[in-house]
Amino acid sequence: MLKQAESMLKWAIEKDNYTTSEKIGLNDYRHVHESLGIGFIALEDIKEDEKLVSFKKDSVLCLTNSDLAQLPEVQSLPSWAALLLVMATENASPNSFWRPYLSIFPTKERITSPFYWDENKKDALLRGTVLESNEDCNEITQLWIDRIEPIIKLYPNRFSQVSYEDFLRMSAVMLAYSFDIEKTKSPISNENEKSAAETSIKEDKNGDAAKKNEGSANQDDEKLHSQSLVGNNCEVNSEDEFSDLESEVDPDELEKAMCPISDMFNGDDELCNIRLYDINGTLTMIATRDIKKGEQLWNTYGELDNSELFRKYGFTKKKGTPHDFVLIKKEHWLPEYIEKLGFEEVEARLELLCREELLYNLEGDFTFSKADLTFKEICLAFVLMEKEKELISVPSKSDIKPKHYRKLLKIIEKRINMYPKISDPKNFDEENAKTLIEGEIDILQNLSAKVKEALTKNRPKKKQKVDH
């Protein structure tokens, strides 16, 4: 594994115009934890602000750098979907320029995220968690049917070797290793703008796609720690991957890309000592503090909670993260009100809660995090749903009664009982699921304690006997 990663590093430097500092080198960290795989180590002391890796934007795998950018049907895809097709197309070509990079992508068996889990496994290990309804794999399957297959049929010579199975695998890889980088005008796209929209591409005789397509090489197939782009004109965000998450990234300004070498750094938001910056069009990894010889170099994955770490990168942090949260979903509290008021009336009242910023989604889900265990909003929702007449304003805090606190306590108790019991994890999947579950239960128990405290304070005092 280390040898393969070293070969890729050599290729990136010699063939893809990457430069690296002599002060860093690859190291096998599997003895520390299997999820770490291969990472970078400081071979000498490194000073803050030292440049460690640099490369141009034409050295990354993305649609702009691919000859697939000439296809209007591919251009019309979301950035992440276009990147997937580029990756799968390159991987289908034995002579691809990106072969050394593609060869170190994790195999399906080495992907430790729950991307490939079937419904039975999800129910057994993730029931009740934030990830219980995750549909990443199903969404990719639907994308394949609705958007990718028609493109393949339209250009059979170009895409005949692209398989659904490999497209799925590239999805899991991209989820863990992609960056959002600022778009640049490529000769290909400029040419495309001048030509008619129907212009098609001729198949390369040797089957190679242009040098710049995608890849998301993980330093070694097993490393599922994150990589992120931060700094001038760059985004850390890779949360627009699938439709369950709305991206804050402007598709006209940024695009999804795979960056060899940069995605070989393990990531930890707390240990982070390097960052990737865009400096006048050159992407550069810079030390954010002094680093001692022998230290591992850590990129950052941003402010993610444990469920997102597991979903994207296939690992969890034992002690959780400051961003962990739990959901009380509509199905945990709304059914009785729908039965009583009807769906349309409940929906109207949810809209009212949203307008008053007491609820932040029309689905009716409430979020509670480590940092914010405020429960006034859900209690006001109970009060609002109990009203028989149509309302034009939400109730006030004074309308919250002890019965509403007791109702919330019952819901919390039911939520805690929903989780699977994993007392003795037998593998990495069970280990991660157990960590996720314990973190959510901890938040719910803390929430319960705060509600009980409020209930005690608001309990009516018994009338005292007055002796005459």
UniProtKB/Swiss-Prot annotation:
<comment type="similarity">
    <text>Belongs to the class V-like SAM-binding methyltransferase superfamily. Histone-lysine methyltransferase family. SETD6 subfamily.</text>
</comment>
<dbReference type="GO" id="GO:1990625">
    <property type="term" value="P:negative regulation of cytoplasmic translational initiation in response to stress"/>
</dbReference>
<dbReference type="GO" id="GO:0016279">
    <property type="term" value="F:protein-lysine N-methyltransferase activity"/>
</dbReference>
<feature type="region of interest" description="Disordered">
    <location>
        <begin position="188"/>
        <end position="225"/>
    </location>
</feature>
<keyword id="KW-0808">Transferase</keyword>
<dbReference type="InterPro" id="IPR050600">
    <property type="entry name" value="SETD3_SETD6_MTase"/>
</dbReference>
<feature type="domain" description="SET">
    <location>
        <begin position="22"/>
        <end position="302"/>
    </location>
</feature>
<feature type="binding site">
    <location>
        <position position="301"/>
    </location>
    <ligand>
        <name>S-adenosyl-L-methionine</name>
    </ligand>
</feature>
<keyword id="KW-0949">S-adenosyl-L-methionine</keyword>
<keyword id="KW-0539">Nucleus</keyword>
<dbReference type="InterPro" id="IPR001214">
    <property type="entry name" value="SET_dom"/>
</dbReference>
<dbReference type="InterPro" id="IPR044430">
    <property type="entry name" value="SETD6_SET"/>
</dbReference>
<dbReference type="GO" id="GO:0032259">
    <property type="term" value="P:methylation"/>
</dbReference>
<dbReference type="Pfam" id="PF00856">
    <property type="entry name" value="SET"/>
</dbReference>
<comment type="function">
    <text>S-adenosyl-L-methionine-dependent protein-lysine N-methyltransferase that monomethylates 60S ribosomal protein L42 (rpl42) at 'Lys-55'.</text>
</comment>
<keyword id="KW-0489">Methyltransferase</keyword>
<dbReference type="InterPro" id="IPR046341">
    <property type="entry name" value="SET_dom_sf"/>
</dbReference>
<protein>
    <recommendedName>
        <fullName>Ribosomal lysine N-methyltransferase 4</fullName>
        <ecNumber>2.1.1.-</ecNumber>
    </recommendedName>
</protein>
<dbReference type="InterPro" id="IPR011383">
    <property type="entry name" value="N-lys_methylase_SETD6"/>
</dbReference>
<dbReference type="GO" id="GO:0005634">
    <property type="term" value="C:nucleus"/>
</dbReference>
